[in-house]
Structure formats: C-alpha cells, structure tokens
C-alpha cells in the first residue's frame, strides 16, 4: 500500500540499467508518480511524466535512482559517481528550483550498497546528516547490498553479488533518521553507535572501519 499522496522518481543516470530501474519503480504507482531525469553535474532536469504541482504539497516520497559504488577499505562510497555532499547539494537545488522548497516526507535511495561499510564508507549516514543540517530533515532509506527493481516494482537484494540468488529486502533495508537537536542519527530505530557496534560483532565491519572517519566525528554518535 502506498501511504503517500505523490511519488517523485529522480533518475540520476542515463544508462539502460538506471532507466530500467526507474521504469520498474514507476510501474508500481503510475497514476501517483512523476519521473524526472536530473543531472547532479549540470543541474539540468527534464520531467518525463507527471505533475510537478502535485509534488509541491502533501505527503511526498522521493526515490532517487542511480548506481552505488562501494569500495571498502575506508574509501567513501559514491552514488551516481557523486559524493554524499554533491548528492545532497544537488537534491537541495532540485527542491528549491522545481518543488517550491517542499520537503519530501521520505527519501529512498535506490542504489547498490549505499548503507554498507563503516562511518567513512557509509553513504546514507553522511547523506542524512548533510540533508538534516541543510534543513531537509527527512528519513532516508538505503540498502546494504546490491539491489534490483523487478518488473512489478518489487525490490530484490543480492547478498553475494548480482550473479547470486536474490532475497527480499528484510535485513538489508536501513532507515536513517537525523535528530537536529543532538546531531545524532538513528538507524532502524537504534542509535547509529549501537548499529555499527552490532555490525562489528556480526563481522560486517572491522574495528578500523568503525573508528576511522574524515568527515563525521564517530564519538558524536555516542
């Protein structure tokens, strides 16, 4: 069930995989969804389908679609070849230029492994903080493994890579919430510090991944 009055799909790249994922996501709620192609580099955009005015009020969900690239080894993950700061700056521009400064009620980042890694690697963690600090305080959904959108609009996760078996998003879908009063982040309703400690215990992270960060102070999360 769709609990939003309108959905905005933002296609960040022009390749066939991204276009296919955007089209499949659109097929889920076609009468209540707009599709906009947007370049984070040039800030140019093109509305393929939908009514911009419906995205300027009400309960709106944004879904950005592009490739996530997770490198590991404490290297920052990129999304559509952009850093978290470039991505969030681009979204804030789009919000002001196209959507009359109307904040979305949720942001879904469709891209591989955007919720994977430690503090320096985790794209979604950085994005939700940067958005919150720029007055776009919105829950952010991201996934910690490779993801595909099927023809029926359903999301499937590939835990061992794109050539392995697929599963549902359960256990791989992470919802990030930024608390502007404290500067802290919750991930799936637990403080980020507890989330990362749990990831360390599960073998998802090394200790070096947990403590190293060039942008975010890990101690602030505690």
Predicted regions and their residues:
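Catalytic-core segments of thiol-dependent peptidases
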Residues: 2, 6-118, 204, 209, ...
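Active-site-proximal C-terminal subdomain of hydrolase catalytic domains
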Residues: 106-222
